């Protein structure tokens, strides 16, 4: 249910107006993007979310609501309420582990997602790369960063292999191991893009695991594994630049030292892969 309001509500106002019988249970602070909190009434639970990026346009938060509204409940939480600065979605019972599931199981989840109807908006990386450059700490803007940005701008994004709806933030912390199978949470970066971009963006432990995930996906998608892996590799510079830029952007927003450490590590990976 979308609900429009020009004036953002406080947490207490939200609960008293829309969920008067519910009470907060716990706050989630895991992950790099921010937290949310859980509300409960007689065994029924919802997750109350706010935009992770306070500087992002409201349209980005609305897109997340729209994506969840059209996705099947077997892979994503169903939304119940959207209004300015707040979204309420189903709580997904299950276990969030610290490591990825079996690559074949994960490939099956991603392939099923990629068979769903498209969201209706494209993921384009270059505007994000340029935004992160502009919004980063000037003292952190290096000649090498600018050189790589210009190189990608000139090269342009790889040609699409297959255009599908993507999650774009697949890692162990966003996967719920439920009784009915794997499900994905945190859909704030979702949009339509190349399936190989999604596979390139998965937070894997090592190259062997990455290759196996791509091979398992290729089998389901009836694509030659070598062809799919080549396409995944074409996206690597874009993804590493995206991660490094996002970490730099979040460092300037929050001052949290973990983002500097992650940015430095990603810059080192970029140098190795050039």
UniProtKB/Swiss-Prot annotation:
BP terms from Gene Ontology: thiamine diphosphate biosynthetic process; thiamine metabolic process
The keyword ATP-binding appears for this protein: yes
Pathway noted in the entry: Cofactor biosynthesis; thiamine diphosphate biosynthesis; thiamine phosphate from thiamine: step 1/1
Source taxon at top rank: Bacteria
Keyword annotations from UniProtKB, A to Z: ATP-binding, Kinase, Nucleotide-binding, Transferase
Record has Lipid metabolism as a keyword: no
GO molecular function: ATP binding; thiamine kinase activity
NCBIfam families, per the entry: PRK10271.1, ycfN_thiK
Function statement: Catalyzes the ATP-dependent phosphorylation of thiamine to thiamine phosphate. Is involved in thiamine salvage.
Protein name (database record): Thiamine kinase
Annotated organism of origin: Escherichia coli O6:H1 (strain CFT073 / ATCC 700928 / UPEC)
Phylogenetic placement of the source organism: Bacteria, Pseudomonadati, Pseudomonadota, Gammaproteobacteria, Enterobacterales
């Amino acid at each position: 249910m979308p609900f429009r309001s020009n004036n953002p509500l406080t947490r207490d106002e939200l609960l008293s107006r829309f969920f008067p019988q519910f009470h907060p249970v716990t706050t989630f602070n895991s992950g790099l993007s921010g937290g949310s909190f859980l509300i409960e009434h007689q065994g029924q639970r919802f997750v109350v979310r706010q935009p992770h990026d306070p500087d992002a346009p409201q349209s980005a938060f609305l897109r997340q609501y729209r994506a969840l509204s059209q996705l099947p409940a077997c892979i994503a939480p169903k939304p119940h309420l959207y209004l300015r600065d707040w979204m309420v979605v189903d709580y997904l019972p299950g276990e969030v582990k610290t490591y990825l599931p079996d690559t074949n199981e994960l490939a099956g989840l991603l392939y099923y997602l990629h068979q769903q109807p498209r969201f209706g908006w494209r993921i384009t990386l270059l505007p994000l790369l340029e935004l992160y450059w502009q919004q980063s700490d000037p003292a952190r803007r290096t000649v090498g960063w600018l050189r790589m940005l210009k190189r990608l701008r000139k090269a342009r994004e790889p040609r699409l292999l297959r255009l599908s709806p993507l999650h774009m933030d697949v890692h162990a912390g966003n996967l719920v191991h439920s009784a009915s199978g794997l499900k994905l949470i945190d859909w704030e970066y979702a949009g339509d893009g190349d399936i190989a971009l999604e596979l390139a963006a998965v937070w894997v432990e090592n190259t062997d695991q990455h290759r196996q995930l791509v091979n398992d996906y290729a089998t389901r998608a009836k694509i030659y594994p070598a062809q799919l892996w080549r396409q995944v590799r074409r996206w690597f510079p874009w993804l590493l630049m995206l991660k490094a830029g996002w970490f730099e952007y979040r460092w300037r927003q929050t001052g949290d030292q973990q983002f500097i450490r992650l940015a430095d590590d990603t810059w080192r990976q970029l140098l190795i892969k050039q």
